[in-house]
């Protein structure tokens, strides 16, 4: 679950406050002491717009999130949300086509034939119908311009064109130059309002391939087995985002159109942006292009599914070619639950890569080959999982028993209270890093919107975390961790369910690579104000100091967040000594005469700091990073290692 953190001390209860510039007719909500200074608008048609300004680079990360995903798929057409995500790149009446008036009758015929096809059971008849679909699709392709959406994005200098579908959401991503907001909004509004389903059967082939690949992915099979065990009555467990083979072989364009008209409406969408822009001007542009979209006053609501308590382990077995492993999973409340904070901290205490229970007791003591723990993070329910691979001569049940022993330690409070403080510090560090990145900042908005979390609660998270006690963690663990878990054995062997979907033969379509729509030409012809480059001036932008030992120091204050980054540059590398790189890398595994490696790892984790080594031919770079407030202690600890490195014989 992605959260936003406030690194300013919140001395008062955070209240969501309405604010509005006198110069703008658009009212927005904001939260005091929000480090992102987010503005949250709601247009008259219900469209949510989340804006945060970050002028580090002249670019803007945009996400358009739709609150619909695999859990909303009709039972007879599972995989629909994911499939439609693919079709959103096929164009509209204005682009992706040379002549929509000529193309439309053919597309209508294809839609009607697919309705007949999906209801036909005789294989010979189905084959004949699909042949007709293929023939008409070829004729329709003469009018289509495949990949013109990509050309539009290239025309405005966009990067990272992509989309993803989960159980709870479908999200469309673009990273655009700061001077292309108008063009971007114009294209996206047309795309979301006037989507045309073309290239259907060829895209179906792509979806088939994705499904076929999933059938041989042992990790995905384990994931789906965990969900089916924990959520036997909820769509999380009863269906998958990719859909069943049977449903994918019987698609319905009519159902997909109804799906678009039902869910892809402004009162079920959010535009999330982070970057270099004027929020007052930006909301005007968004309203100009998206403000006329019609909401759905009858937006469906999924029936609330109350899962029955799990009273004994639900055991499942997965077969595949990957190495054997075992996974345990427990069910928890969803992302908007007040207990989400406790779950996040519990996850850090159990496994953080440095000083968690699994790290210290199992990984560092080499009791298993490998292991990890974490959460799935979904809106309606959450899941906490532990997964591990056995050593040679060890059974999957041995690993399971080791996991359960660690859970018992958690429930008994058999862990240092300082681990909780350290977990909070590291959670704070993680969120600080996210403030540095436009993609992460905008993604926080997406998570809040999809999970139904008020922004004030996101901003106040660190304040809440700082008040959590060890006893609360222990009580939480005893409340949720019992014999109520999913137990998935991943064993080596041939999976009898790996029956791939046969792809029907299709005629290669006409690509029309050199064609362009009028819409694309109009976008290409738009003149925008150029972005003026800003160059680093070493004399003005960097402060130069000299340490007591005459070592030169270059310094630049971090004005974005409370994270420091310190680089030690050693004028020696592998050209001086071939063992140099290995020697510096070995530092990560050394203790000192006063501290063991375990103690050093725990102290770095407590400080929410870490170091990395980058050996080069002529220089070696050592990077020390972490919370600014702990920089002196982290430097002292690191320099203690440099001065007194010792092999930890234990």
Residue ranges and their predicted role:
Residues 52, 57-70, 79-81, 97-190, ...:
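M16 family metallopeptidases and their MPP-like homologs
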Residues 20-51, 278-319, 325, 329, ...:
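Proteolytic maturation boundary segments
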């Amino acid at each position: 679950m992605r959260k936003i953190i406030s690194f300013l001390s919140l001395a008062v209860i955070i209240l969501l406050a309405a604010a509005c510039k006198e110069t703008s007719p658009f009212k927005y909500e904001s939260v005091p002491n929000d480090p992102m200074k987010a503005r949250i608008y709601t247009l008259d048609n219900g469209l949510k717009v989340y804006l945060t300004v970050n002028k580090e680079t002249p670019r803007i990360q945009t996400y358009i999130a739709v609150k619909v995903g695999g859990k909303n798929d009709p039972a007879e057409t599972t995989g629909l949300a994911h499939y439609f995500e693919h079709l959103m790149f096929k164009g509209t009446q204005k682009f992706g086509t040379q002549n929509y008036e000529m193309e439309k009758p053919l597309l209508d015929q294809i839609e009607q034939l697919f309705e007949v096809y999906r209801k036909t059971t005789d294989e010979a008849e189905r084959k004949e119908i699909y042949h007709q679909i293929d023939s008409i699709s070829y004729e329709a392709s003469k009018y289509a311009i495949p990949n013109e959406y990509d050309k539009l994005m290239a025309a405005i200098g966009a990067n990272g064109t992509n989309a993803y579908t989960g159980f709870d959401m479908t999200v469309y991503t673009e990273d655009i130059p700061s001077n292309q907001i108008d063009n971007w909004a114009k294209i996206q509004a047309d795309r979301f309002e006037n989507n045309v389903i073309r290239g259907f059967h060829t895209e179906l082939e792509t979806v088939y391939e994705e499904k076929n690949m999933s059938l041989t992915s042992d990790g995905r099979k384990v994931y789906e087995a965990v969900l089916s065990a924990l959520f036997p009555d909820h769509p999380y467990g009863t269906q998958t985002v990719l859909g069943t083979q049977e449903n994918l072989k019987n698609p319905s364009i009519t159902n997909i159109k109804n799906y678009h008209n039902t869910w892809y409406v402004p009162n079920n969408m959010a535009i999330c942006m982070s970057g270099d822009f004027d929020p007052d001007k930006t909301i005007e542009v968004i309203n100009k292009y998206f403000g006329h979209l019609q909401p759905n006053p009858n937006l469906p609501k999924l029936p609330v599914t109350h899962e029955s308590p799990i009273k004994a382990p639900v055991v499942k077995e997965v077969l595949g070619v990957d190495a054997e492993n075992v996974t345990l999973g427990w069910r928890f409340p969803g992302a908007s639950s007040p207990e989400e904070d406790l779950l996040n901290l519990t996850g850090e205490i159990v496994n953080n890569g440095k000083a968690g229970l699994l790290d210290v007791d199992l990984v560092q003591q080499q009791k298993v080959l490998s292991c990890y723990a974490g959460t799935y993070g979904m809106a309606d329910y959450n899941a906490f999982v532990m997964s591990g691979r056995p050593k040679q001569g060890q059974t999957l049940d041995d690993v399971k028993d080791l996991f359960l022993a660690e859970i018992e330690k958690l429930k008994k409070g058999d862990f240092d209270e300082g681990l909780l403080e350290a977990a909070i510090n590291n959670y704070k560090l993680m969120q600080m890093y996210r403030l540095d990145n436009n993609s992460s900042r905008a993604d926080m908005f997406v998570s809040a919107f999809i999970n139904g979390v008020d922004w004030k609660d996101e901003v106040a998270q660190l304040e809440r975390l700082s008040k959590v006690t060890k006893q609360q963690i222990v009580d939480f663990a005893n409340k949720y961790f019992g014999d109520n878990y999913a137990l998935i054995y991943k064993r080596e062997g041939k999976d009898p369910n790996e029956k791939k979907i046969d792809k029907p033969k299709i005629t290669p379509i006409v690509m029309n690579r050199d064609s362009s729509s009028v819409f694309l030409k109009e976008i290409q012809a738009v003149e925008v104000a150029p972005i003026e480059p800003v160059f680093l001036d070493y004399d003005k932008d960097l402060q130069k100091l000299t340490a007591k030992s005459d070592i030169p120091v270059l310094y630049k204050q971090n004005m974005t967040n409370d994270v420091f980054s310190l680089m030690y540059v050693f004028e020696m590398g592998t050209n001086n000594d071939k063992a140099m790189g290995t020697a510096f890398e070995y530092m990560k595994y050394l203790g000192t005469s006063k501290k063991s490696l375990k103690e050093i790892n725990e102290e770095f984790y407590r400080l929410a700091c870490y170091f990395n080594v980058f050996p080069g031919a002529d220089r070696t770079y050592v990077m020390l990073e972490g919370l600014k407030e702990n920089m002196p202690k982290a430097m002292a600890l690191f320099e203690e290692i440099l001065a007194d490195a010792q092999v930890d014989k234990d």
